[in-house]
């Protein structure tokens, strides 16, 4: 088996839908994707029954990340990072609304979809219509946020598409401000914490200054991800680096599936954290409801 894997190309695969754009190499996908996740069951099935509280997911609507060398990485939200945490939340009884910056369809990295994982696939099928026709985030801010909003948490999944637009959006900034001011949860993982950069947009300091976070390691995006052909070049900027410059504390430098809670900010380091982050979010949200 290892010999067969080693024969796979480490050259990124051309994406014929766009000029000079590439999917991850066959070899990198053999290392980073699998037909099943580590999902081991739902801990609180149906535990939330009142129906009021919901999750607002801010999904990526842009497919391509322009790299330093002029090539583009064909990406999107990582399906495991999006759908496995949501599986735990939805099975616990929380409804999910999907929003993108412009209201355009959410983009997923279908090449990372675990096709034999019932938890992920079933959640994808339930959300597919919302992913194709999401809400526009500005409309959500105008009509559905405020102290009496039904959203208990804001969820930003990972995938490299999170570094495009979401990290420098005034609408994301307003959403994060609302969550912080109204004691709501912010849940994100892998490259999703790029969204937290928007909190410091045009400000002397970020309201998230001093918060500790898990995030995808910059060292992998600078090294192994390029060497094995996952990325067709270097990113123009690195998530952990810029978070650190906004005085957030990045607690990991590797990818182990680590999760972290700092106040109402719940983070995970990679796709490996998806299952545990979903469990953590459910536990924290249920506890918050009991204490309201």
Curated annotation (Swiss-Prot):
Name the catalytic site residues. 190
Query: Its catalytic activity?
Result: N(omega)-(1-hydroxy-2-oxopropyl)-L-arginyl-[protein] + H2O = lactate + L-arginyl-[protein] + H(+); N(6)-(1-hydroxy-2-oxopropyl)-L-lysyl-[protein] + H2O = lactate + L-lysyl-[protein] + H(+); S-(1-hydroxy-2-oxopropyl)-L-cysteinyl-[protein] + H2O = lactate + L-cysteinyl-[protein] + H(+); N(omega)-(1-hydroxy-2-oxoethyl)-L-arginyl-[protein] + H2O = L-arginyl-[protein] + glycolate + H(+)
Q: Which GO terms describe its cellular component?
A: cytoplasm
What does the similarity note say? Belongs to the peptidase C56 family. HchA subfamily.
Compositional bias per record (Polar residues), positions renumbered to this chain: 1-12
Q: From which organism does this entry originate?
A: Staphylococcus aureus (strain MRSA252)
Annotated region (Disordered), positions in chain? 1-23
Record's subcellular location: Cytoplasm
Primary location: cytoplasm
Provide the alphabetized UniProt keywords: Cytoplasm, DNA damage, DNA repair, Hydrolase, Stress response
Q: What is its EC number?
A: 3.1.2.-, 3.5.1.-, 3.5.1.124
The name this protein goes by in its record: Protein/nucleic acid deglycase HchA
Role summary: Protein and nucleotide deglycase that catalyzes the deglycation of the Maillard adducts formed between amino groups of proteins or nucleotides and reactive carbonyl groups of glyoxals. Thus, functions as a protein deglycase that repairs methylglyoxal- and glyoxal-glycated proteins, and releases repaired proteins and lactate or glycolate, respectively. Deglycates cysteine, arginine and lysine residues in proteins, and thus reactivates these proteins by reversing glycation by glyoxals.
The record, for PANTHER family, names:
PROTEIN/NUCLEIC ACID DEGLYCASE DJ-1-RELATED, PROTEIN_NUCLEIC ACID DEGLYCASE 1
Instruction: Please name the GO terms that the record assigns under molecular function.
Output: glyoxalase III activity; protein deglycase activity; thiolester hydrolase activity
Alphabetical list of HAMAP family matching this protein? Deglycase_HchA
Q: Which SUPFAM superfamilies match?
A: Class I glutamine amidotransferase-like
GO terms classed as biological process: DNA repair; methylglyoxal catabolic process to D-lactate via S-lactoyl-glutathione; protein repair
Q: Which CDD domains match?
A: GATase1_EcHsp31_like
Which superkingdom is the protein from? Bacteria
